[in-house]
Amino acid sequence: MDQMEVPDNDKNRKYPTKDLKIILPKTYADVNSKKGPEYWDYENITLKWNVPDSYEIVRKIGRGKFSEVFEGLNTVTKDKCVIKILKPVKKKKIKREIKILQNLRGGPNIIKLLDIVKDPQSRTPSLIFEHVNNTDFKTLYPTLTIQDIKYYIYQLLKAMNYCHSQGIMHRDIKPHNVMIDHEKKILRLIDWGLAEFYHPEQEYSVRVATRYYKGPELLVDMRYYDYSLDIWSIGCMLAGIIFKKEPFFYGHDNYDQLVKIAKVLGTEDLHRYFEKYGLKFAPAYQEILGNHSKKPWTKFVHHENQHLVSPEVMDLLDRMLVYDHTKRITPLEAMEHPFFNEIKNNSV
């Protein structure tokens, strides 16, 4: 459900970070410097916790390393809600998640934080969210039509563009964190526990995201990443849904994950990426990476997915799944891509 950055261990670094080439993102690079510390300085906020008397737990719906998630009931309004009970974790991390959710409140397709409560006896903190009647992605994705896929990916991009426009990277986009009420055609992006404010030229932990959706920058210990990490994860999701191969890049560990990516995108562009940023391969890669030519997307087409594949979606994947994070399409650019033409035309 959720995970957390593990403290970085210097001896595990794959290359020295000095003399690295840093390129700022195409858009929203200076959002936080314009907004100022009162917007992004979560460590110094004072939270006002309410008591949990108005909420009742109905049933458990999920758990992660750092929380347990329940369907709940607001006993005053009789509305369903979701209760995320946080396990003991650093106060700083809790403050960050809450500050980000508060900053994004009202944004398109962003899960709404309704309340924050703390049990007076146990001091256990909980976050109260709006309820979404979600269908598990393993059940839902195989049933989606191409129109459904366009609609939901567009809604996800809309959430992502808003989040980035507010100076925030999600850093854990994956099917488990995208709630879909298919009957009502509602999508919500959840689990902001790994989200972080973007500041230019700041080093970030590479121990974020979930393996199958990790961008190459995380796998090669490139710490000066930015919003473009999220578009890689969306590209992985889109490829998985379109080709009915979930997860699309199925690595057994972080090293193997990059190998799985290289077997599709080829090793030539990967070497180019390393040269551009002055990166060095970890010794572990020397033996396992090999040489691979770029595979055309048509190699993944078969009789069960061919009705979903088009030149437009393959072109969009080409623009999302790019080693060099600075060359990836942005969410706003992606929303203008011809793949979404009928969605845009219908919403006018």
From Swiss-Prot:
- Which SUPFAM superfamilies does the record match to this protein? Protein kinase-like (PK-like)
The record's section on PROSITE patterns has:
PROTEIN_KINASE_ATP, PROTEIN_KINASE_DOM, PROTEIN_KINASE_ST
Pfam families listed in its UniProt record: Pkinase
Q: SMART domains, from UniProt?
A: S_TKc
**Which class of enzymes does this protein belong to?**
transferase
Q: Which CDD domains match?
A: STKc_CK2_alpha (cd14132)
The record's active-site residues are D172
Tell me which Gene Ontology terms the entry assigns under biological process.
regulation of cell cycle
Domain Protein kinase per the UniProt entry, residue ranges: 55-340
* Catalytic activities: L-seryl-[protein] + ATP = O-phospho-L-seryl-[protein] + ADP + H(+); L-threonyl-[protein] + ATP = O-phospho-L-threonyl-[protein] + ADP + H(+)
Membrane-spanning regions, if any? none
Q: Which UniProt keywords apply?
A: ATP-binding, Cytoplasm, Kinase, Nucleotide-binding, Serine/threonine-protein kinase, Transferase
The Enzyme Commission number assigned here is 2.7.11.1
Compartments, as annotated in UniProt: Cytoplasm
Checking InterPro entries in the record gives: CK2_alpha (IPR045216), Kinase-like_dom_sf (IPR011009), Prot_kinase_dom (IPR000719), Protein_kinase_ATP_BS (IPR017441), Ser/Thr_kinase_AS (IPR008271)
Q: Which GO terms describe its cellular component?
A: cytosol; nucleus; protein kinase CK2 complex
UniProt-annotated binding residues for ATP: I61, G62, R63, G64, K65, F66, S67, E68, V69, K84
Q: Does the keyword Cytoplasm apply?
A: yes
Q: Name one GO molecular function term.
A: protein serine kinase activity
* Function (record text): Casein kinases are operationally defined by their preferential utilization of acidic proteins such as caseins as substrates. The alpha chain contains the catalytic site.
Could you say which protein family the record assigns here?
Belongs to the protein kinase superfamily. Ser/Thr protein kinase family. CK2 subfamily.
- Oligomer and partners: Tetramer of two alpha and two beta chains.
Q: Specify the protein name.
A: Casein kinase II subunit alpha
Q: What is the lineage of its organism?
A: Eukaryota, Sar, Alveolata, Apicomplexa, Aconoidasida
